[in-house]
Each structure stands twice: as C-alpha cells, then as structure tokens.
Amino acid sequence: MLCFVFGLNNVTVLCYNVPIKGAGLMEEQLISKKELLERTSISYGQLYRWKRKNLIPEEWFIRKSTFTGQETFFPREEILKRISMIQKMKENLSLDEMREMLSPKMKDVSMTADELLHKGLVSRPALEAYSEDGGSPVFSSSDLLSLFVLEGLLQSGNVSLAEAKMAAEVLKKHDTEEIEKQTELIVLRKLGVTTCFIAAAADSILFESSVKVVERVDLLKASEELKTTFMQEGHQWM
C-alpha cells in the first residue's frame, strides 16, 4: 500500500493507492464472457482477434474464480461501449485503422482557434481558459486533447473558469504520448480549495472523507472521443 500526502494551499490531503487488477468493480459492474458474446452477437474468435489487435485492452480481461472454475469477466460499461464502437467503425475502417483510432497516441493534427470555433469542437470559454493571450495560435494534437477535456469540464457545470485554467496548466505539462491505461485527470476540492492532478490506476485511490472529488476525466477515453468527433466532422485522423 502506498500513502500520499500533498498540500492544497496549507490544506493537507491524504490518499491511499492500492493497485489491484479488477479492484473497485462490483459484480453488477462486470459482464461474463459468455453473456458478452450472446449480447453482442460476436464470436469467441472475433473477441480475441480484437484483443490481439489491441482494440480491446488486456487489462479488461479479468479472471475470477466462480463455482464452475475460472471465468473471464469484463468491465460491463467499457466493453459494451468499445464493441459497439468497433462494430460501427469496421464498416469503413480496417482493423489497423481502428487500432490507430483507439490508440492513446495522438497523430500530428493542427487547427486554428477560428477553425475549432467554426466546427463547434470547443467553445470560446475553453479557448480562453487554455490560451490567456487571446490570440489565434495553431493548436497541436496535444492542445486539441487538452481543449477537448477542458470543454467537458466547463460543460459539466461543476468547474469554475478559474478551476478550468488550473486544469489547463496541468494538461499542458502532460505529454499525450505518455497517456497510460487508466490515466485520469482528477479535480479535488477541500475546504473551498481546489487542486487537480493526473494519476494512473486512479480507480484505486481512496480519499479522506473531507475531500470532494469534483471531476474525474479518463484521458484515454477522452482521446478516443476526440478522434471520433474529429472524424465525424469530415477529417481523417490517420
């Protein structure tokens, strides 16, 4: 067990990290392999072919003991959403193209502020929170992901503009090439003081009771959603 203590402007926050594969998932949050195949009408071979192509993360295959022996389970919401996405994309994309789409790595893409606003990918408040100078720079792939996350934070209504700017500073320092599985941006508030950080395996972090978790953003999922939204606007990400 690892224990972390950090300060929020003279306010101390204590959290624990106990990384266990599949930990934190209740039985109702899991789906068995048998039920998954029946519900999605895919074959055993398709499932494992997608796994070999890295379309489905290795850590989603969770082995658990049951009264019949060892069985494979998956995080229900994530696997159903992923398979639905694969089934929709396979009509127009090859497996390799889908792997690129679902990869956390961001290809080189650039857009100006005017282009982002015109296409409705982000709002002006998100742009202002990310770029203090108010100009119209060209935003890179890394910037696009950060802006996409900021837009979601502001749209949630749970984060103020000042807090969004704080999140922007954290995201700017985070290399999108280093996005790992289960990496999250976490916004905390304690006694009216807000902070945010990026953590891996964040589902296993337990905060003290006085800390309010304002927002948690899965950066890998955000990357996937950004790529999907980008392509829906008529662009090619690859």
UniProtKB/Swiss-Prot annotation:
Name of this chain's protein: Uncharacterized protein YhbD
InterPro entries: DUF4004 (IPR025063)
Pfam short name (any one): DUF4004
Lineage: Bacteria, Bacillati, Bacillota, Bacilli, Bacillales
Source superkingdom: Bacteria
